[in-house]
């Protein structure tokens, strides 16, 4: 009970408490005085709103939203008929897709841009620079100054300017941060703002046309009022003017959102807009920037002027310039995207708009006079609305004087408007509509459906592939049908290249192949400029896919060979696009990038490559420096390290910029990574170039120098310690002085150098460096941990380090700081820790390490248990279980059983670990086998498929150990259990069960197997129909093993049934399955005789599928090899009589494989098959001749030295006429046959055939004969000497070599 209040204060407090409790009551439980009443909502379905049940909004379309009409309601008032559907619980179980779900998303080829991180996205900000001057063109003549080509000097100046600007901005930012920036009221601020002039106010000398002569960029920089920001607006490192053709010059990717900027308004922090410094505005100061939200709102139909009043004469453009300004060529017009129609098209342009540009809704309707192209692209509703509006405008237009005179009686006159009168022009009164007649009809208009949109052509005409929406901006010219004969040669060339590129990018393989060959052959005719100007922007496309990039890179690779030195002016352009490939995560992309840069270096030469890439070496942007360093490494590998050494020496010792030194040293590091042991001849020179970097004043330079030393030492392993003598001292000092990243790099270098040293030195250095390593064990930095682990591994792996030292000094802190849960979460740390621990175990023994981590097999974190298991598996795989005592053995078995049972993820780590440990322990496992088998049997009954699969897999891993422990009874029991589980419905589990049965059959033998083989095999026959690869592979292996070792346990009828099932397995995608299948045919034929099996196989030659026929021919050859060829050849040769192409080719293919397999046994059958081969070598069908040539090749190689030369010479006469075939497959087979015949009948006879055509008048004949002669020469050079024709001496020359005739 509450305490009774006695004093006045207590009473007041109690009252306040009661009032507070009342206020806290839920207001929903009561009814307010002025509120509506509430019904029982369970019965009547009440609502808080008085408007419930009313339609609160009208749909935009005139169709009512019917969803509400069928919503189920349980109220008595206004009860609707309930709909019938599935129970709510069932519906909730079905995952509902979101509105934006794309069912095809996972099947679409991924775009490169989707997988790029922030750093790699940098490549899209790079600008494809304009062509540069080729100093070697025209024999090195002085270039014509009128060409305006950018020279090396221009690029370096721009680089210098960019760098200065960056530094100034940095200083300003620092001053602003420190509060030292002051507003200076100078002379410029006191000048009155320039008055805006209308164009009517201009005097004669201010005519816009009288633009003074264009100044050079350096003169402009000194002109008052002109801020030299022309080049500072660029992305660092890439010069201006390199924009994609058609892009607005001067608009950069980092520019602010375009907005309406009146004249004189400066972009903050940028000075005047580049290119807009017009004469007459020199001393004007910039007015405050105008906010677009402060302006008078305008619709699209307003006067498209320049921020001026309503009464101005409309102008054609919408730039932000004042009317008085002269638009400087090349200057960017700052436009507002809000006051433009989506596709502003000039009236005279071709009336086809690319998709995505169609004006929709208001913009299209608000156009004053749409051009024919715009009319074409309007929707029918827009066109109808526009026609009505035009008719109303036509009726409400101002009346002309003639019309007024006709309407009014005489006596009226027109009064002049009062002075200063400005007519009111509101957006609603569309008085600025241009009265351009379009020949339309007024009056009643029949509303017919407008089909113009349906015929808009968004695909190129002619035999061109499908154009994706993303490609339209690059290939839009192909959408316009033009008469190509009317175009200029340059335009024709451009269209031709565009067509070829579209075929390569989007075409079918045959189309792509032809286009690639054509663009390669005509590369010099097209020229480097037109080709690269179209290919490179495509490669920069943000929607590019891997396959498309691969194809375009292949185009560049091919045309580089053809263009050769013509490529020099475009080297930088190509590098900007290709360099990002060097840091791509895809290995093949990196290889392609290296290949292109390598070919480019060979085509352009060292001087061009250095002069092109030199400005990028000290670029302010780290991304550019990184990619440039990698590219230089590729150039070094292509042109040789010695040619680049003088340049590298100069760069690495640059005093002007630390960026240059940093990049130079990085180039050395990348050369070492790329070229590996190929740096050994130049190792001392490379070390000398970068050694001073270890004591540089810049931290980043010191770090990269240490990393470069580490890379060089890694590449040179195990040689070259003498070359590193000069850097040992600074490295040693460095590891004592540095902390953080710098220390990590120095430790890495020491770590790679210690394995190169002699044993006594390695021991001394390891002891010294270990003090620092042990200190850094507790570092929280992930990168430092990885390096410390790596260095510990390297130090402990050297010969001079003793096991006792490692046990006492290293192991305690190592396990304390590294064997933690957090290390198992990061994959790179996980891998490094396992490797280092295994290396320590190699020194100190398995028991020492395993005893420290065995208890962690029962840890609660699965990832940590996996790390422990993997470490134990590797240690025991390397060192065995000899030094593991009985107690540790028990702990180990107990731990791995626990870890195996507790695993939740499907991973092979636990399985591999279990198998390795059990196999390493061998007979010592016998006491634990009942426990292991009990666990396995119990888990085979588990409802989870993954658990059952792991249990079956474990049986296959431990079967060998069970045999070693003589537990055949246990294995027989397991075999019966597995046999009962052959009805398993999950294919992954069934595959594992078959694998376990196979393992048991292998070790227990056929006669002891339970269940018996005669029961097991019929159970396997239907499983062969299963299409799952794992099931197929394990099942065919098991059947093959039984056919090989226990065929007598099964009836011939069952084997024939299996033969028919095996034919289906020949269609399998996996080669291992097909190989096992054809081998099984051989085993079965050996068991039941070849005739029935052969009949089955010969029938299979009639099928259409090529893969099936080829596998069948291989099976026939294997049957022939197994059961002797005479059992197969009669039937095979008889089958050749069937007048069907596939069958005849199959027979020839079988003969080819047959003679390949039987080798020298072929000597007995060569005369039998010669008539068949004669017929095949004279057949009209190319494939017959090709396959018959292959038969001749294998046959002649098999019978070499067995006296069959007469038959082979006969066949040579049939093979020889085919040497002039053009099909690459046929000519390859024919050349193979000739090679085989060279071996079998000797090079002399081949030379005699060859000599007749070596000097033939026709070049095509000579080419073929010389090709054959070259192959004979390569194969039997010495044997030919005795057989060259004797050429007698003439008056001038002595051809006979008499010494060859000497006979002793």
From Swiss-Prot:
The impact of changing residue 310 to A is:
Abolishes interaction with RBM39
Q: Where is this site: Interaction with RNA?
A: 469, 587, 1035, 1049, 1141
Q: Where is the composition biased (Basic and acidic residues)?
A: 104-119, 231-241, 291-304
In the record, the effect of residue 278 to A is given as: No effect on interaction with PPP1R8
Q: Which residue numbers mark the cross-link Glycyl lysine isopeptide (Lys-Gly) (interchain with G-Cter in SUMO1) in this sequence? A: 413
Interaction with PHF5A: region residues = 547-550, 1156-1157
Q: Which key words tag this protein in UniProt?
A: Acetylation, Citrullination, Isopeptide bond, mRNA processing, mRNA splicing, Nucleus, Phosphoprotein, Repeat, RNA-binding, Spliceosome, Ubl conjugation
Q: Where is this site: Interaction with PHF5A?
A: 592
Annotated site residue numbers, Interaction with SF3B3: 602, 677, 1205
Outcome of substituting residue 244 to A: Slight inhibition of interaction with PPP1R8
Q: How does it assemble?
A: Component of the 17S U2 SnRNP complex, a ribonucleoprotein complex that contains small nuclear RNA (snRNA) U2 and a number of specific proteins. Part of the SF3B subcomplex of the 17S U2 SnRNP complex. SF3B associates with the splicing subcomplex SF3A and a 12S RNA unit to form the U2 small nuclear ribonucleoproteins complex (U2 snRNP). Within the SF3B complex, interacts directly (via HEAT domain) with SF3B3, SF3B5, SF3B6 and (via HEAT domain) with PHF5A. The SF3B subcomplex interacts with U2AF2. Identified in the spliceosome C complex.
Q: What task does this protein carry out?
A: Component of the 17S U2 SnRNP complex of the spliceosome, a large ribonucleoprotein complex that removes introns from transcribed pre-mRNAs. The 17S U2 SnRNP complex (1) directly participates in early spliceosome assembly and (2) mediates recognition of the intron branch site during pre-mRNA splicing by promoting the selection of the pre-mRNA branch-site adenosine, the nucleophile for the first step of splicing.
Q: State what protein this is by name.
A: Splicing factor 3B subunit 1
What species was this sequence derived from?
Homo sapiens (Human)
What gene is behind this protein?
A: SF3B1
């Amino acid at each position: 009970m509450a305490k009774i209040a006695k004093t006045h204060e207590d009473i007041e407090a109690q009252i306040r408490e009661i009032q507070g409790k009342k206020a806290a009551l839920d207001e929903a439980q009561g009814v307010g005085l002025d509120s509506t009443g509430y019904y029982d909502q369970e019965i009547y379905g009440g609502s808080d709103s008085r408007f419930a049940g009313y339609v609160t909004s009208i749909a935009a379309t005139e169709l009512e939203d019917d969803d509400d009409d069928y919503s189920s309601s349980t109220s008595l008032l206004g009860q609707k008929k309930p709909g019938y559907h599935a129970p709510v619980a069932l519906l909730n179980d079905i995952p509902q897709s979101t509105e934006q779900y794309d069912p095809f998303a996972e099947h679409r080829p991924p775009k490169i841009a989707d997988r790029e991180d922030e750093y790699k996205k940098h490549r899209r900000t790079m600008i494809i620079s304009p062509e540069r001057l080729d100093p070697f063109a025209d024999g090195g003549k002085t270039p014509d100054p009128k060409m305006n080509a950018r020279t090396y000097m221009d690029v370096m100046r721009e680089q210098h300017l960019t760098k200065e600007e960056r530094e100034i901005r940095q200083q300003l930012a620092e001053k602003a941060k420190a509060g030292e920036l002051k507003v200076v009221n100078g002379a410029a601020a006191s000048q009155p703002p320039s008055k805006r002039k209308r164009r009517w106010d201009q005097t004669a000398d201010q005519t816009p046309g009288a633009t003074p002569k264009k100044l050079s960029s350096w003169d402009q920089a000194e002109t008052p009022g002109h801020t030299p920001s022309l080049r500072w607006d660029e992305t660092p490192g890439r010069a201006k003017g390199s924009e994609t053709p058609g892009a607005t010059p001067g608009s950069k990717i980092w520019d602010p959102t375009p907005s309406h900027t009146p004249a004189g308004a400066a972009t903050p922090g940028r000075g005047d807009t580049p290119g807009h410094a017009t004469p007459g505005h020199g001393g004007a100061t910039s007015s405050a920037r105008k906010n677009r939200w402060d302006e008078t709102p305008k619709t699209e139909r307003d006067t498209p002027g320049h921020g001026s009043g309503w009464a101005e004469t409309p102008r054609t453009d919408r730039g932000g310039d004042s009317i008085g300004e002269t638009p400087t060529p090349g200057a960017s017009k700052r436009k507002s995207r809000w006051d433009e129609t989506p596709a502003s098209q000039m009236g005279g342009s071709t009336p086809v708009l690319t998709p995505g540009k169609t004006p929709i809704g208001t913009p299209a309707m608000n156009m004053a006079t749409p051009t024919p192209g715009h009319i074409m692209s309007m929707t029918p509703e827009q066109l109808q609305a526009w026609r009505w509006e035009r008719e109303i405008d036509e009726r409400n237009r101002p009346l002309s004087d003639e019309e007024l005179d006709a309407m009014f009686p005489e006596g009226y006159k027109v009064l002049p408007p009062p002075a200063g009168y400005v007519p009111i022009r509101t957006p609603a009164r569309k008085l600025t509509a241009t009265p351009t007649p379009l020949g339309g009809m007024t009056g009643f208009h029949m509303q017919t459906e407008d089909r113009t949109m349906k015929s808009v052509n968004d695909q190129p005409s002619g035999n061109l592939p499908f154009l994706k929406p993303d490609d339209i901006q690059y290939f839009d010219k192909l959408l316009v049908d033009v008469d190509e004969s009317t175009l200029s040669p340059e335009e024709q060339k451009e269209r031709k290249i565009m067509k070829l590129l579209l075929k390569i990018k989007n075409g079918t393989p045959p189309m792509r192949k032809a286009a690639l060959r054509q663009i390669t052959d005509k590369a010099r005719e097209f020229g480097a400029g037109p080709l690269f100007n179209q290919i490179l922007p495509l490669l920069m496309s943000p929607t590019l896919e891997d396959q498309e990039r691969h194809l375009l890179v292949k185009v560049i690779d091919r045309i580089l060979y053809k263009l050769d030195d013509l490529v020099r002016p475009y080297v930088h352009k190509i590098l900007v696009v290709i360099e990002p490939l060097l840091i791509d995560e895809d290995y093949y992309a990196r290889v392609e990038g290296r290949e292109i840069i390598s070919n480019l270096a060979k085509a352009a030469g060292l001087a061009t490559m250095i002069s092109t890439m030199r400005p990028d070496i000290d670029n302010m942007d780290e991304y550019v420096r990184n990619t440039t360093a990698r590219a230089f490494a590729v150039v070094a590998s292509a042109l040789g390290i010695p040619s680049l050494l003088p340049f590298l020496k100069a760069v690495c010792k640059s005093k002007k910029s630390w960026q240059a030194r940093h990049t130079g040293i990085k180039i050395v590091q990348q050369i070492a990574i790329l070229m590996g042991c190929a740096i050994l001849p130049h190792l001392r020179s490379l070390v000398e170039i970068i050694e001073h970097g270890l004591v540089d004043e810049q931290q980043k330079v010191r770090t990269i120098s240490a990393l470069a030393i580490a890379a060089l030492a890694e590449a040179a392993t195990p040689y070259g310690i003498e070359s590193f003598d000069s850097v040992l001292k600074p490295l040693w000092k460095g590891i004592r002085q540095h902390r953080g990243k710098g220390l990590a790099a120095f430790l890495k270098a020491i770590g790679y150098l210690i394995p190169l040293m002699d044993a006594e030195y390695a021991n001394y250095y390891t002891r010294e460096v270990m003090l620092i390593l042990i200190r850094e064990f507790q570092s929280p930095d992930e990168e430092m941990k990885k390096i410390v682990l790596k260095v510990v591994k390297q130090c402990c792996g050297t010969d001079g380090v003793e096991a006792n030292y490692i046990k006492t000094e290293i192991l305690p802190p190592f396990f304390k700081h590294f064997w933690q849960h957090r290390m198992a979460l990061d994959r790179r740390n996980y891998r490094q820790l396992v490797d280092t621990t295994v290396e320590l175990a190699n020194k100190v023994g398995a028991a020492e390490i395993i005893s420290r981590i065995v208890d962690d097999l029962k840890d609660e974190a699965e990832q940590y248990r996996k790390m422990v298991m993997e470490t134990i598996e590797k240690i025991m795989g390397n060192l065995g279980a000899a030094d593991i005592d009985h107690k540790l053995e028990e702990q180990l078995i107990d731990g791995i059983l626990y870890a195996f049972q507790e695993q939740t993820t499907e991973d092979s780590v636990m399985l591999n670990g279990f198998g390795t440990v059990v196999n390493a322990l061998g007979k010592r496992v016998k006491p634990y086998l009942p426990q292991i088998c009990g666990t396995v049997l119990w888990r085979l009954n588990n409802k989870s498929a993954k658990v059952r699969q792991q249990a079956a897999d474990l049986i296959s891993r431990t079967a060998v150990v069970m045999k070693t422990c003589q537990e055949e009874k246990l294995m027989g029991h397991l075999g019966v259990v597995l046999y009962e589980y052959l009805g398993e419905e999950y294919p992954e589990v069934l595959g594992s069960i078959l694998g376990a049965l196979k393992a048991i059959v292998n070790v227990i033998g056929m006669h002891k197997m339970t269940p018996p083989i005669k029961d097991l095999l019929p159970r396997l026959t239907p499983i062969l129909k299963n299409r799952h690869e794992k099931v197929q592979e394990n099942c065919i292996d098991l059947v093959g093993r039984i056919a090989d070792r226990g065929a007598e346990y099964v009836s011939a009828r069952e084997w024939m049934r299996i033969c028919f099932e095996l034919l289906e397995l020949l269609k399998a995608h996996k080669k291992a399955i097909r190989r096992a299948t054809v081998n099984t045919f051989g085993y079965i034929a050996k068991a039941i005789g070849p005739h029935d099996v052969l009949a089955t196989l010969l029938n299979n030659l009639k099928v259409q599928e090529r893969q099936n026929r080829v596998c069948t021919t291989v099976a026939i050859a294997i049957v022939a090899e197994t059961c002797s060829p005479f059992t197969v050849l009669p039937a095979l040769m008889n089958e050749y009589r069937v007048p069907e192409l596939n069958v005849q080719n199959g027979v020839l293919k079988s003969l080819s494989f047959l003679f390949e397999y039987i080798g020298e046994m072929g000597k007995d059958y060569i005369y039998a098959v010669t008539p068949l081969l004669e017929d095949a070598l004279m057949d009209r069908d190319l494939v017959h001749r090709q396959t018959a040539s292959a038969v001749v090749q294998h046959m002649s190689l098999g019978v070499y030295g067995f006296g069959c030369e007469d038959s082979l010479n006969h066949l040579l006469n049939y093979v020889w006429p085919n040497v002039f075939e053009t099909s690459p497959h046929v000519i390859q087979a024919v050349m193979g046959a000739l090679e085989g015949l060279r071996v079998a009948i000797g090079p002399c006879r081949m030379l005699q055939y060859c000599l007749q055509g070596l000097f033939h008048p026709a070049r095509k004949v000579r080419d073929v004969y010389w090709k054959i002669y070259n192959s004979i020469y390569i194969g039997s050079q010495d044997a030919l000497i005795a057989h060259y024709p004797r050429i007698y001496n003439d008056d001038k020359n002595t051809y006979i070599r008499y010494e060859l005739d000497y006979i002793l």
